[in-house]
Amino acid sequence: MTRLDSVERAVADIAAGKAVIVIDDEDRENEGDLIFAAEKATPEMVAFMVRYTSGYLCVPLDGAICDRLGLLPMYAVNQDKHGTAYTVTVDARNGVGTGISASDRATTMRLLADPTSIAEDFTRPGHVVPLRAKDGGVLRRPGHTEAAVDLARMAGLQPAGAICEIVSQKDEGSMAQTDELRVFADEHDLAMITIADLIEWRRKHEKHIERIAEARIPTRHGEFRAIGYTSIYEEVEHVALVRGEIAGPNSDGDDVLVRVHSECLTGDVFGSRRCDCGPQLDAAMAMVAREGRGIVLYMRGHEGRGIGLMHKLQAYQLQDAGEDTVDANLKLGFPADARDYGIGAQILVDLGVRSMRLLTNNPAKRVGLDGYGLHIIERVPLPVRANAENIRYLMTKRDKMGHDLAGLDDFHESVHLPGEFGGAL
């Protein structure tokens, strides 16, 4: 296993004006970025970064800084597959030449981090790429953008960083992988951490959710405790249906049966047959009830895989015209799946979960939660409820999104499909 350094060392190095290496999830970009605080930028540091990276230097910024400086999105509808929020490129208006030299880019970086700078201090376009970090940092989005801003803030500096991906010195044209990054870090006396480490550190030292209320909810599957939560970063309320003791005198928070269910008004409430959401929710509640211990976490704000109810209905229109559930999202300018599991992970931790058996057919959900320090010991499949209205939707989820859905081909061959229909999101 590759040796890593402590988050405390990385924060101290950032505060001292040094660079660090941050590695993300192997199921995400699986790359290591060189990161330092933007306000500490020097020509020497920028030159070092250019020499050992792709050279596409970016400056992650807190959202408030982007707003103050009028840094608009590079494109109106973000189509980056990881949701990286690129803004219009900039150069410092004064004190630079063409803007491309190490000295010029260091000047622009420091100016972006300067709390007294204003929009008119920059020209557009330029040679430095600001990135807008998501509010809540790595707890909301486990990316290098958020890691850079979090590290700067944790170091007591302005929430602005500088990042770029480290390239391989052994395999020209490729990005450096973990073992090579460790060698590089040791050669240059750089701390190396993972985003997962940073998430775990913040989870232990910070809290971004609030437990509001708890009440008894009798259901046809038996009685649950409904525990309501809010998040300081979004105006959305979530509810956890809890059965049994999760953590306490007689339970240690391990081996908990958990379903993280995304809100679906059409399927959960109206009983739409275009998706399998309602049957999945019902099955999850039944399985937790039979177990006698577990959680069904109902995540609001996840309608349509995160695009919202109105856009979901627009996607239905496209599906009725022949698009599948993935292409409909893409045609509307959204990613195939825009859901964020960070708040859900914090709620599970607050409920005392340490390790869990996750009720899902979606491997990406496992990755989304695993990156937040929760240990998933098993993925437990949910029964697939195929019908003539959702079979194409289910097959698209299987074929394009990697969902583990068995038996669909046999069902598909046994039914007459009523034209080009689509599924829920």
Curated annotation (Swiss-Prot):
GO biological-process terms attached to the record: riboflavin biosynthetic process
Pathway where it operates: Cofactor biosynthesis; riboflavin biosynthesis; 2-hydroxy-3-oxobutyl phosphate from D-ribulose 5-phosphate: step 1/1; Cofactor biosynthesis; riboflavin biosynthesis; 5-amino-6-(D-ribitylamino)uracil from GTP: step 1/4
Essential for DHBP synthase activity (site feature) positions: H127, E165
UniProt binding sites for Mg(2+) 2: E29, H144
Cofactor annotation comment: Binds 2 divalent metal cations per subunit. Magnesium or manganese. Binds 1 zinc ion per subunit.
Residues the entry annotates as binding Zn(2+): C264, C275, C277
Region (GTP cyclohydrolase II): 205-425
Pfam families: DHBP_synthase, GTP_cyclohydro2
Residues covered by region (DHBP synthase): 1-204
Catalytic activity: D-ribulose 5-phosphate = (2S)-2-hydroxy-3-oxobutyl phosphate + formate + H(+); GTP + 4 H2O = 2,5-diamino-6-hydroxy-4-(5-phosphoribosylamino)-pyrimidine + formate + 2 phosphate + 3 H(+)
One GO MF term: zinc ion binding
Catalytic residues of the enzyme: D337, R339
EC number: 4.1.99.12, 3.5.4.25
Residues binding GTP, per UniProt: R259, V260, H261, S262, E263, Q280, E303, G304, R305, T325, T360, K365
Record keywords: GTP-binding, Hydrolase, Lyase, Magnesium, Manganese, Metal-binding, Multifunctional enzyme, Nucleotide-binding, Riboflavin biosynthesis, Zinc
GO cellular component, one term: cytosol
Binding site for D-ribulose 5-phosphate: R28, E29, D33, R141, P142, G143, H144, T145, E165
Cofactor(s) needed by this chain: Mg(2+); Mn(2+); Zn(2+)
Binding site for Mg(2+) 1: E29
PANTHER family documented for this protein: 3,4-DIHYDROXY-2-BUTANONE 4-PHOSPHATE SYNTHASE (PTHR21327:SF18), GTP CYCLOHYDROLASE II-RELATED (PTHR21327)
Family to which the UniProt record says this protein belongs: In the N-terminal section; belongs to the DHBP synthase family.
Protein purpose: Catalyzes the conversion of D-ribulose 5-phosphate to formate and 3,4-dihydroxy-2-butanone 4-phosphate. Catalyzes the conversion of GTP to 2,5-diamino-6-ribosylamino-4(3H)-pyrimidinone 5'-phosphate (DARP), formate and pyrophosphate.
The name this protein goes by in its record: Riboflavin biosynthesis protein RibBA
Organism: Mycobacterium avium (strain 104)
